[in-house]
Amino acid sequence: MATSANLDIGAQLIVEECPSSYISGMPDIKLEHQLDPNPDEGAAQGVAMGMKFILPNRFDMNVCSRFVKSLNEEDSKNIQDQVNSDLEVASVLFKAECNIHTSPSPGIQVRHVYTPSTTKHFSPIKQSTTLTNKHRGNEVSTTPLLANSLSAHQLAAQGEMLYLATRIEQENVINHTDEEGFTPLMWAAAHGQIAVVEFLLQNGADPQLLGKGRESALSLACSKGYTDIVKMLLDCGVDVNEYDWNGGTPLLYAVHGNHVKCVKMLLENGADPTIETDSGYNSMDLAVALGYRGVQQAIESHLLKLLQNIRE
C-alpha cells in the first residue's frame, strides 16, 4: 500500500469531509515560511507548465508507470490490484493521511492533515456532524432550530435554499469564507447542489475565488462529475486550467474520477490535456494508468480533432 511519504502526483483535490475538488497564464505563487510546520496536507502551491516546485509527501507517478508496464506480465492481475489500491489511497484527488514527520523544503507552507474516510470518496473538506448524518441517511428532517444553527456554508451544502437566502440577505455572507477559504458556492458545488449553485451565481457569488490551497468550485465539481454545475461555472468564465496546491487541474480531477462527460466538457472549453504533473504525467497518462478506457478515448478523440484542425 502506498504511504504518504511517497505521495508525488501533480493533481489532488477534494470533497467529502466538508470545509470547516492548468493554466493559461499562471498567476504568481507566494511561498510562505513557517518556523514550526506541521506534517499536514502535504505541501504547498502546485505548479503548471514550465514551473516546478519540489513538494514533499506527494504520490509518486512511477506507480502509474509500474501499473502500465505490469499489464503484460504473468502476474499482472495481482500487481494491478495492488496498484489500484495504491492509487485509491494516495490518489491525485485526495490529500492523504500523514503519520510520518517530514522536513518540508524551505519556503513551502505546510498545512494540516486531512484524514481520508475508509471509502474511496473522501476529500479535504471537513464535514460537520450534521452533514455527515445527512449523507448517512440518519437525518429525518431539518427543523427551523437546527437550520438556524447552521452556517451559510452548511446550508449551501445541504441545499437549504430558503434559509440560505434569508441568511445572505440578513448577513451578506454570499462570499464569506470559512477557515479553509471555502465559500458557500464551493460547498454547494462540492455537494452537487445545482439549484443552490445557480441561486448563488445569480446573486453575486464569485466563482473565481480560491481556497487557501487554491481549491476552486470548478475542481470540486469536476472531482465528483457534477456536469450541470461544471457547465454553469464554465459559462461564468472561470479558468478551466486553474491549478491547486498539489498541481491538480479540473481536467485531472475529472480524469481521476472517471467522469467522461466532465472530461469532454472541459476539453471542449479549452482544458489543456498536455499539462503535466511534476513527474511528467499528463491526463492521458493518468487515464491509461487507471484503465479508464472511456476517458482515454475522449482525450484521444479531442487530440485527433486538434491535429485535423492544424492540418486544415
Curated annotation (Swiss-Prot):
Coiled-coil ranges per UniProt: none
UniProt superkingdom: Eukaryota
Chain positions of ANK repeats: 147-179, 180-212, 213-245, 246-278, 279-312
Membrane topology: Peripheral membrane protein
GO molecular function: histone deacetylase binding; low-density lipoprotein particle receptor binding; protein kinase binding; ubiquitin protein ligase binding
Domain observations: The ankyrin repeats, mainly ANK 2, ANK 3 and ANK 4, mediate interaction with a wide array of PxLPxI/L motif-containing proteins including HDAC4 and LRP2. The PxLPxI/L motif of interactors can contain a Ser or a Thr residue in position 2, which phosphorylation prevents the interaction with ANKRA2.
Cited function: May regulate the interaction between the 3M complex and the histone deacetylases HDAC4 and HDAC5. May also regulate LRP2/megalin.
Protein name per UniProt: Ankyrin repeat family A protein 2
